[in-house]
Amino acid sequence: MSEKKEFTHLHVHTEYSLLDGSAKIGELVKRAKELGMDSLAITDHGAMFGVIDFYKACKEEGIKPIIGCEVYVAPKSRFDKNSRESVSYYHLVLLAENMEGYQNLIKLVSLGYTEGFYYKPRVDEELLRKYHKGIIATSACLAGPVAKTLINGSYDIAKDMALKYL
């Protein structure tokens, strides 16, 4: 008898991740159910437009919805919109652990649009420190802070970057 292996995708883009995601929420959730998954995350780029549809679809299928977002983090300040560096950013996946985390995630994403928008909705370290409660952060993708630093060959800086989010 083989033991059931549990697996949850924690970094998932839907059709709301423009130019990056193509999965339609309903189909995605149904497929997760077919594969025997009991939970699934949504982490669209810089937006939470699909969260309500995702939540409802997951509940209908008996899957635990994990609400998240892959945010863009400005290297310095979200208000910096004049320097060459201000167009750069790194990715960070944020997952709501509880209701407080969900509310903080909504604040972060909203402020990314209202205060930090420069080509993309950006947050910064100040906002992440202020609204971190109830949120789990992962290093995202190759555009994440740890991966970018490792790719550049800076192990010690990457380690410091990872430890910053503990």
Language-model segments: which ranges?
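Phosphodiester-processing cores and adjacent nucleic acid-binding clamps
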Residues: 1-166
